Amino acid sequence: MKIWIDADACPRVVKDIVFRASERLKVPVCLVANTDLSRAHTSLITSVRVKAGFDVADDYIAENAEACDLVITADIPLAARVVEKGGVALDPRGELYTEENVGERLSYRNLMAELRTDGLLVGGPAQLGLTDRNRFASALDRLLTKMVREHRSQ
């Protein structure tokens, strides 16, 4: 079992929450980004630096994450790929991507992108607030505890 973080756009506070959970539960973490993140390394935390380019980090995670792994990402197309493979994906606001909701979230994302392209909508999602951080920490704790228990009982 491993936690993968789509690290290019992941807020620092979310990474810190994941790092603390990783240490507490002894679950390895792999940060994937097109920048050097080696300073974050510990015995449980590693990183992979991919080439710069559209979806390169996403492709790496989708190809390497296994069904027993957890992926932290705000990228809905990546989450859809992970869920399709039977994996688990969580966004930085604590929302779990599931087979039931990922298609709808992908459609909504595509609509918003189209509205932005047409100039009918400006900006992106709101900045991560304290409520979001707390929701993420709670969701991560519940999910990881369950996943670790299931993984270690096999």
From Swiss-Prot:
Disulfide bonds: none annotated. Coiled coil: none annotated. InterPro entries: UPF0178 (IPR003791). It holds the Pfam family DUF188. It comes from the Bacteria. Belongs to the UPF0178 family. This is UPF0178 protein Gbem_2221. It comes from Citrifermentans bemidjiense (strain ATCC BAA-1014 / DSM 16622 / JCM 12645 / Bem).
